[in-house]
Amino acid sequence: MLIIRWLAYRAVMPEEELFKSEAEQSRAEIAAALVEAAEQIETGTIQLANESTEQDVSIPETPRFETELERLTDSETGEERYELEYEIRWTR
């Protein structure tokens, strides 16, 4: 399953998590999920699904798109963890 995080963002409103999916997958599986997501985004509607819920999301013609790479370092062990995030954001 693909992790896609989306927000109907308002500056003064608290964040409400509407959907989350997370699983270890191969690079090939992740790439296939991203291709599928890209095709759905291009149509303007994306279907999010996991084992317990399903949700359709309409994406406007010109949302904001953010790419972020983070490195988090454990202060005790020095172990580094990386997070690559793609985020689509818009207001309604």
Where does each model-flagged region fall?
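Intrinsic, low-complexity terminal and presequence regions
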Residues: 4, 8-9, 60, 83-90
